[in-house]
Amino acid sequence: MRAVIQKTVGAKVDVVSEAGTETCGKIDGGFVVLLGVTHSDTEKDARYIADKIAHLRVFEDEAGKLNLSLKDVGGAVLLVSQFTLYADAASGRRPSFSQAAPAEQAQRLYLRTAELLRGHGIHVETGRFRTHMQVSLCNDGPVTILLDSFMTRISPKMKVVPD
């Protein structure tokens, strides 16, 4: 599971259709998280990503150090599904998305990640799965962090959330 985490002072996601544009998620401050799911992802990956998002210390304390977490500052998450995080553009000019999980699996783990974040006491707004969306945000910092739960399987230094 891959997550691109962007610290924001405000963000929204709109669903665009023939009927028009509808805002389906909006936050005042916290993180915009673009979340991609691959074939081998499980509940364990969702737990790892949710735990990292909740506890990443990238907000400034009184001394100006990045020492506070999303939970510490009462921030929210705008969670947006993003299968293109598993694009492979190594050959040719059109990316392959074969590493992205099938829609049913991806949606289940996307919703589970949102549920796990809520379990941490974090307010979560979401995009709408399998729709055309437009994400607007005002980056803060900017701070952008890439997480990949696969790294926990190949690096002994990475901490894994216990079962």
Swiss-Prot record:
SUPFAM superfamilies: DTD-like. GO terms for biological process: D-amino acid catabolic process. A motif (Gly-cisPro motif, important for rejection of L-amino acids) lies at residues 141-142. InterPro entries: Daa-tRNA_deacyls_DTD, DTD-like_sf. Keywords: Cytoplasm, Hydrolase, RNA-binding, tRNA-binding. Pfam families: Tyr_Deacylase. GO terms for cellular component: cytoplasm. Its main location: cytoplasm. The keyword Hydrolase applies. It comes from the Bacteria. It is found in: Cytoplasm. It is an enzyme of class 3 (hydrolase). It catalyses: glycyl-tRNA(Ala) + H2O = tRNA(Ala) + glycine + H(+); a D-aminoacyl-tRNA + H2O = a tRNA + a D-alpha-amino acid + H(+). The keyword Cytoplasm applies. One of its GO terms (molecular function) is tRNA binding. Its EC number is 3.1.1.96. An aminoacyl-tRNA editing enzyme that deacylates mischarged D-aminoacyl-tRNAs. Also deacylates mischarged glycyl-tRNA(Ala), protecting cells against glycine mischarging by AlaRS. Acts via tRNA-based rather than protein-based catalysis; rejects L-amino acids rather than detecting D-amino acids in the active site. By recycling D-aminoacyl-tRNA to D-amino acids and free tRNA molecules, this enzyme counteracts the toxicity associated with the formation of D-aminoacyl-tRNA entities in vivo and helps enforce protein L-homochirality. Belongs to the DTD family. Homodimer. A Gly-cisPro motif from one monomer fits into the active site of the other monomer to allow specific chiral rejection of L-amino acids. This is D-aminoacyl-tRNA deacylase. The gene is dtd.
